[in-house]
């Protein structure tokens, strides 16, 4: 749902506005989930070996939130994400069950970096 990626229209068509690009607290792991298309990231909070993950903060009108959440397929959902600044905000999280067949891509530090590496390797 990040800006300029395939599912971003699900935010913008509901009047969501981009607030800022930032990072999570260094308490998460990032995975490329099995299945698709589209390819989907899954971010999971961990007790150790976590890392800061690049993310975007968007503001959506409350009246549009329910229709947006209905579009989110399992194992993804909306939960509480801690930012690098310590704020706790609603954001995408992934259930542990979604990690079956997933690839740990935490080393890339974010979904865009992972996508860029895939594009570069396919050239």
Outline where the language-model segments fall.
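Glycine-aromatic micro-motifs
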Residues: 1-123
